[in-house]
Amino acid sequence: MPLNIEDKKAVVAEVSAQVAKAQTIVVAEYRGIAVGDLTKLRATARQQGVYLRVLKNTLARRAVEGTPFAGLAEQMTGPLIYGISEDAVASAKVLNDFAKTNDKLVLRAGSYDGKVLDVNAVKALASIPSRDELIAQLLGVMQAPVSGFARLLGALAAKKSEGAPAEAEAPAA
């Protein structure tokens, strides 16, 4: 059933609000995907904080008009699903991971930081760890020396308590 003009304006406003907050948009062709698979994709996207939507391309073009993603309008042809995310890699990661397991989803293009990305660039973006993963790695690197030092102090304390108390009180040279 076609949308009336008010519904179209509402859709454009909703998508424009998402685009205004977004860092990345990824576009993929979805011909022939089963409803169950598409439902799984939407659930995964929701968990990752990705706004996933099937839109008429004309409405999508209007939503990105005047934004850093306007260059993506040329790629908006055919049956497309749009992944929009505030996290720079989340939408690329969700759609790329799904495309690996479902050959009917074909990545077409993306846009990040005002630049239009081709398929290989979207895949490269998807391979970058997310912000949360990077923070976890950084904390792990920062925590390792502290943990090692704490274990060393614990081992020294245990050795001192086992050793003769006279050695501990010996004058330093």
Curated annotation (Swiss-Prot):
InterPro entries noted in UniProt: Ribosomal_uL10, Ribosomal_uL10-like_sf, Ribosomal_uL10_bac, Ribosomal_uL10_bac_type
Q: Which UniProt keywords apply?
A: Ribonucleoprotein, Ribosomal protein, RNA-binding, rRNA-binding
- For this protein, what is any one GO molecular function term? large ribosomal subunit rRNA binding
Matches recorded under CDD domains: Ribosomal_L10 (cd05797)
| GO BP terms | translation
Q: Name one GO cellular component term.
A: ribosome
Q: Does the keyword Ribosomal protein apply?
A: yes
Record text on subunit structure and interactions: Part of the ribosomal stalk of the 50S ribosomal subunit. The N-terminus interacts with L11 and the large rRNA to form the base of the stalk. The C-terminus forms an elongated spine to which L12 dimers bind in a sequential fashion forming a multimeric L10(L12)X complex.
> What role does this protein play?
Forms part of the ribosomal stalk, playing a central role in the interaction of the ribosome with GTP-bound translation factors.
The name this protein carries in UniProt is: Large ribosomal subunit protein uL10
User: What is the species of this protein?
Assistant: Cupriavidus pinatubonensis (strain JMP 134 / LMG 1197) (Cupriavidus necator (strain JMP 134))
- What lineage does the source organism belong to? Bacteria, Pseudomonadati, Pseudomonadota, Betaproteobacteria, Burkholderiales
